């Protein structure tokens, strides 16, 4: 029997990219999934009996609570895992070219929404005395030289929240970890408009980006499925003593 058989997991950003790859893999191993996304449900999972979908904007005040209420309605009272995958990029803006809108939107999607979802699931996990949360960061969560200031700050903040939650609830059977993908080809970059990017800031990071781009040209690039494998490991019992970890998945890009 799979280690994920019948566990209940909430996956945000499940309509594409890492979220879709993770939901697909989890379902293949017997998990029951509530997928959440601002976009419509992925056609590839529409007919799966263990996949339920909720469309919604996680930055809206009531959405995080509605997510948990929907999960309980669909699958009963348990929530075994929360995978905070949904995220957006900024315009690679430096602090002196940053708009209020981009700052507030990045913080809302990448930091506030995951924290509010953790706030909603923690009481259920405390009652169960078990549960695993994994937050998806980025190379920019541990570096100042790979993205704009808003995205970088939001992902650094999420790593701090991850560590705090891990320490606070470690004696109650609840784990909280993070993974930091680097250079995964998903729709997150394509969703932003290149004409609005801060070209000067991007130029200062070009050598960092080029160092990683060479891996993909040699067939060594990181794929969404690679991230999914680690996420599913972290919500399984095989990782039961891994708590508060920040795990890079970038073929050593994070060492520079």
Curated annotation (Swiss-Prot):
Query: The organism's lineage?
Result: Eukaryota, Fungi, Dikarya, Ascomycota, Pezizomycotina
The metabolic or biological pathway listed in the UniProt record of this protein is:
Secondary metabolite biosynthesis; terpenoid biosynthesis
Task: State the function annotated in the UniProt record.
Answer: Short chain dehydrogenase; part of the gene cluster that mediates the biosynthesis of andrastins, meroterpenoid compounds that exhibit inhibitory activity against ras farnesyltransferase, suggesting that they could be promising leads for antitumor agents. The first step of the pathway is the synthesis of 3,5-dimethylorsellinic acid (DMOA) by the polyketide synthase adrD via condensation of one acetyl-CoA starter unit with 3 malonyl-CoA units and 2 methylations. DMAO is then converted to farnesyl-DMAO by the prenyltransferase adrG.
**What is the protein name stated in its UniProt record?**
Short chain dehydrogenase adrF
Gene3D superfamilies tied to this protein: NAD(P)-binding Rossmann-like Domain (3.40.50.720)
Q: Which gene encodes it?
A: adrF
Q: Which organism is it from?
A: Penicillium roqueforti
| Disulphide bond pairs | none
Tell me the active site.
Answer: 151 (proton acceptor), 155 (lowers pka of active site tyr)
The record, for InterPro entries, names:
NAD(P)-bd_dom_sf, SDR_fam, SDR_superfamily_enzyme
Which family, according to the similarity comment? Answer: Belongs to the short-chain dehydrogenases/reductases (SDR) family.
Task: Cite the binding residues for NADP(+).
Answer: 11, 57, 119, 151, 155, 184
